Amino acid sequence: MEVRFLLFLLLLVLVINPSLVVNMVFGYMFGLLLRNNYSRLKAMIRSNQTEEEEERHEAVDVSNPFEDVDIDVMQHLKTLGLDSKVDEEDVEYFRRFWQSMLRNK
């Protein structure tokens, strides 16, 4: 077909039904968002955990927060003087810092 004929048909559709074009633009934007966040959306759908289970899983034992820490990390904490006692505020700070690092990967 000729390009002018196709453009004329598109113009005719725009004049008759402009909501179709608006729907097409919104669909395109939704598709872009879905394509960029598809892996996160898949993980959310496959996950059957509730928010309470996630919070329980992420809870840190304040009595011994260094239970699963590597040796080199412990040595670095000793040089900073943080190996013996950690306040709850520090644990919250470390948790927020770790979450921000995970988000910015």
From Swiss-Prot:
Q: How does it sit in the membrane?
A: Single-pass membrane protein
What keywords were assigned to this record?
A: Membrane, Transmembrane, Transmembrane helix
Q: Where in the cell is it found?
A: Membrane
The answer, when asked if Cell inner membrane is one of the entry's keywords, is: no
Q: Where are the transmembrane segments?
A: 5-25
The lineage's top-level taxon is Viruses
Q: Does the keyword Membrane apply?
A: yes
* GO CC aspect terms: membrane
UniProt record similarity statement? Belongs to the nanovirus U4 protein family.
Annotated protein name in UniProt: Protein U4
